[in-house]
Amino acid sequence: MATAKLISQKAKAHAPSLSQATTAEKNSVLQAMAQQLKADADVLLQANQLDIANAKKNGLSDHLIDRLLLTKARIDAMATAIDHLIELPEPIGAVKEEIKRPNGLVIKEMVVPFGVVGMIYEARPNVTVDACTLAVKTGNAVVLRGSASALHSNKAIVHTLKKAFQNSPIHPDVIQLLEDTSKEEAANMMQLKSTIDVLIPRGGANLIQTVLQEATIPVIETGVGNCHVYVASSADPDMAFDIVVNAKTQRPSVCNACETLLVEQSFAKAHLPALVERLSAKGVSLVGNEGACTLDPRIAQANEDDWSTEYLDLRLAIRVVADTNEAIAHINQYGTKHSEAIITESLAERDTFFATVDAACVYHNASTRFTDGFEFGFGAEIGISTQKLHARGPMGLKALTTSKYGIYGEGQVKE
């Protein structure tokens, strides 16, 4: 079985065939990828069923199985996302800034690929497609290390995507999958600074912390999503109910789902029981602080851990707060800097919330479920960054590029 060192060397060796490719050549490969995913759908579903069977046998939770599952509709959605990606402007080669110096030198800041991007991620075979297609569009080779639970799916997907290079000058080895899913080989991959330019972990808190602690390669941190919705006193009740129910139940197993609901006390007294009725009808189990529990007996007492837990399930923590300042303080204490929403008719409250909540994405009168590269018009995403350097929020094409300075002279020398 090939090692991380060997496959990263292959990726780096063939990266120039991609970084020097034309827009038409890259888009042609992407178009072939979309078509091949649809053509190989049955093969992909069969491979995925092996992973699903193993997941059930190994006792994986329902939310992890949902993340692992491929369906015909999900494969079609992947192909559609590639079609949108093709339509996006070419991200490489643009001049971000041009400066002419008094000595006649012209300095241009140009957008270029990283070179080789490494991905370490859990479950979610769709990430394999997103990573490969975004890498092709941005001219980056990619080294993938998925989880053992998705190995059959990932191998089948990579095999399918590599067929798209058949009639292309771009070498198929710009895509590499590490099939050895041992922790030891993952640790080896994190040390390959000479062949991998940037490393992006995508998964649970333990995975991300392990990568941050062990990697010598520069890391773009993607965070877990302990997301909040705060309902202020002036919120429209119908709007608030719709947003909260959507943010929690539309797909509870993903990182942009709401995990804690904060409700201003006067709104809670008037409307919390009706909101609990809506949530309970969707199968959501509820825990809360004393202020919430006294308003509805269906809310069980929360413990301290509930406020910092990413449930990824039909479970919601509810806290009744005195005002917007208390809600903001709670979010900044327990949040993961991912996605936070306020429901209010007060523009002053909105502006305060936006200015003081520390998160990659802040929402006014909308569900947190929109934190997604496709929803933002990025075509796809390689992750959602919760750090502040290089990239923040959904990472699309721009996040997979860096700068190079071209200096144009006519014989100038330094005096």
Curated annotation (Swiss-Prot):
Keywords (A to Z) from UniProt: Amino-acid biosynthesis, Cytoplasm, NADP, Oxidoreductase, Proline biosynthesis
Q: What does this protein do?
A: Catalyzes the NADPH-dependent reduction of L-glutamate 5-phosphate into L-glutamate 5-semialdehyde and phosphate. The product spontaneously undergoes cyclization to form 1-pyrroline-5-carboxylate.
**Species name:** Shouchella clausii (strain KSM-K16)
What is its pathway? Amino-acid biosynthesis; L-proline biosynthesis; L-glutamate 5-semialdehyde from L-glutamate: step 2/2
* Classification via InterPro entries: Ald_DH/histidinol_DH, Ald_DH_C, Ald_DH_N, Aldehyde_DH_dom, G-glutamylP_reductase_CS, Glu-5-SA_DH, GPR_dom
Q: Which family does it belong to?
A: Belongs to the gamma-glutamyl phosphate reductase family.
- One Gene Ontology MF term: NADP binding
Record bears the keyword Oxidoreductase: yes
* One GO location term (cellular component): cytoplasm
Coiled-coil regions listed in the entry: none
- Give the catalytic activity: L-glutamate 5-semialdehyde + phosphate + NADP(+) = L-glutamyl 5-phosphate + NADPH + H(+)
The keyword NADP is annotated on this UniProt entry: yes
Q: What is its EC number?
A: 1.2.1.41
Q: Per its UniProt entry, what is the enzyme's top EC class, as one word?
A: oxidoreductase
Protein's recorded name:
Gamma-glutamyl phosphate reductase
Q: Which terms under GO biological process does the entry name? A: L-proline biosynthetic process
Q: Gene symbol?
A: proA
Q: Name one Pfam family in it.
A: Aldedh
* Localization per Swiss-Prot or TrEMBL: Cytoplasm
